[in-house]
Amino acid sequence: MIIKQSSNVLRKKRHLRLRKIIIGTITRPRLNIFRSNKFIYVQLIDDNAQNTLCSVHSKETNVIGSNIKAAQAVGTLIAQKALALGIKNIVFDRSGYLYHGKIKALAEACRQSGLQF
C-alpha cells in the first residue's frame, strides 16, 4: 500500500533544501515566513549572528484572519520596520511554501513598500 506524505512534511523538505542555499547577513537579512491557519508571521533574520532583527505578525494589523489582505498588511509593516532599521536589500525565504496567493501578496507588498530582493 502506498502511503502519501502530508503536504506539511513535503513543505518542510522543500524548506530544508532551500535553507542550504539561502543565508541572511546583517547587510542582507533573510525574510522568513510562517503561515498558520489563522495568522501570518514574518521575521528578518541575520543567520551569521543568529539574531532576529525585527518581526511582524498579522495580529499586529487591523485585518483579521490569514487572507491575502492580511498578508499585504504584514508585508507593508515589515517593510516599514526594515527601512527604519536601514535595511533595503533582503533575501526572500518562502519557507517551502509555493509562491502564489498569500506568499506572493506579501512579497509584492514588500516590494511596493521599498524592499529589494
Curated annotation (Swiss-Prot):
Keyword field: Ribonucleoprotein, Ribosomal protein, RNA-binding, rRNA-binding
Q: Which residues form the signal peptide?
A: none
Record's keyword annotation contains Ribosomal protein: yes
A GO MF annotation of the entry reads: 5S rRNA binding
Gene Ontology biological process terms from the UniProt entry? translation
UniProt entry tagged with the keyword Ribosomal protein: yes
Gene3D superfamilies in UniProt: 3.30.420.100
Q: Name one GO cellular component term.
A: cytosolic large ribosomal subunit
**What family is this protein classified in?**
Belongs to the universal ribosomal protein uL18 family.
Subunit record text? Part of the 50S ribosomal subunit; part of the 5S rRNA/L5/L18/L25 subcomplex. Contacts the 5S and 23S rRNAs.
Record function comment: This is one of the proteins that bind and probably mediate the attachment of the 5S RNA into the large ribosomal subunit, where it forms part of the central protuberance.
Q: What is this protein called?
A: Large ribosomal subunit protein uL18
Q: Please give the organism.
A: Phytoplasma australiense
